[in-house]
Amino acid sequence: MEEFQVYLELNRSRRHDFLYPLIFREYIYALAHDHGLNKSMIFFENQGYGNKFSSLIVKRLIIRMDQQNHLIISANDSNQNPFFGHNNNLYSQMISAGFAVIVEIPFSLRLVSYSQGEEVAKSHNLQSIHSIFPFLEDKFSHLNYVLDVLIPHPIHLEILVQALRYWVKDASSLHLLRFSLYEYCNLKSFITPKKSISIFNPRLFLFLYNSHACEYESIFLFLRNQSSHLRSTSSGAFLERIYFYGKIEYLVEVFYNDFQNNLWLFKDPFIHFIRYQGKAILASKDTSLLMNKWKYYFVDLWQYYFYMWSQSGRVRINQLSKYSLDFLGYLSSVRLNPSVVRSQMLENSFIIDNAMKKLDTRIPIISLIGSLSKAKFCNTLGHPISKPTWADSSDSDIIDRFVRICRNLSHYHSGSSKKKSLYQIKYILRFSCVKTLARKHKSTVRAFLKRLGSEFLEEFFTETEEEHVFSLIFPRVFFTSRKLYRGRIWYLDIICINALVNHE
């Protein structure tokens, strides 16, 4: 029992004193500057975090606070207080940015020390969105069912604050965070953070959300590792940990001593959990009955342990062979790849039908066309239209914009099993570019193309350097006349989802 208690016990060494009065002192700026917190954010350079929020904003916060000299704040007098007057949004941004810098200090230092090791290249690769797909190719073909989980949001802001109590021992920091959340966010805008993101630092919001998710994922990891015993343990017994530990001790002793040869019936090594964009995937080789058990484990865990309202309808059980999973801009499914093998034994020959499971990743063409339609590159049917807002730019600038979008989409969707949909997207962008240029020069599309020749805009279909290398390695199988590499390529340098890919 002590082993399980140690496992569930959070690592107390990770707790830090985030004294929020530090943001009012001069030396916190020196601390942040000396450790190079901005440079340590190596995985978020493309998001422009270092350009908008840095340790310099903490310096400005210190100066502004000293000038205002309003450190004692009353929530009832927030409308009259000059600290929360017409500059309330500005001060909220400064406070949230300063708080984000403070809470990220230990994590940034840990990241810097880790990046100085020999495995820095590996850590970069693991940050890529595409790094999960080779894992799915290896694992999903052996699995049967998948739970498509819509993660519930906390029903109260206090839950997010309390999620930090294992990480932050200083009550003052929690009071500052609690005050800021209640002062500037209501529950509705926080669940759909379009308004709150403009006020609060996005990294602070993500830090709170991930800290909360870390708690229930650590318990789920315990469930996953002990799934061989939990199959005969109800969720109610799990929540009452005394009975839970007692039942596990009994099961371990009985199974190990008397039924050691039959342990494989109760173990489940083929279970995998992935969390992304407020959703989660639980894939397993279990039967539908056992997957239904996992479904109610999730619901009960969220409702009774983390006080998050959840219903069984938010967790759907699907069979991988009959279901396409909408996952990170791809429709992923497991399909059978039939093959016929002829075997010869002496004078007799046999025809053997062999079907192998293979992960199929396709582009959600309908959703992607919908995204292109919202961006005014085509209509709802996928017919290209001109981009009038770009008609005032130079020809080279217009072409460069379209080519850059086309290559970004090609780069992200390079792992598609079927390139026909990708070619259709390139076709839409190519003729949208032509129509935009024709609109600018007050000409028709046919006359414009006839004047420039058929080689115009060939760079839309020009292969990238990576595709050129693969075409040299596999020239007969994978290289086509359209200069499209037909094999799947997963790039390990993609850390952000393109806005057109994230069509939701």
From Swiss-Prot:
Domain of life assignment: Eukaryota
Compartment list: Plastid, Chloroplast
Transmembrane segments: none
Gene responsible for this protein: matK
Role according to the record: Usually encoded in the trnK tRNA gene intron. Probably assists in splicing its own and other chloroplast group II introns.
HAMAP family: MatK
Species: Ochroma pyramidale
Record protein name field: Maturase K
Gene Ontology molecular function terms on file: RNA binding
A Gene Ontology term for the protein's cellular component: chloroplast
PANTHER family: MATURASE K (PTHR34811:SF1)
Entry keyword set: Chloroplast, mRNA processing, Plastid, RNA-binding, tRNA processing
BP GO annotations: mRNA processing; RNA splicing; tRNA processing
One Pfam family from the record: MatK_N
InterPro entries in the cross-refs: Domain_X, Maturase_MatK, Maturase_MatK_N
Protein family membership: Belongs to the intron maturase 2 family. MatK subfamily.
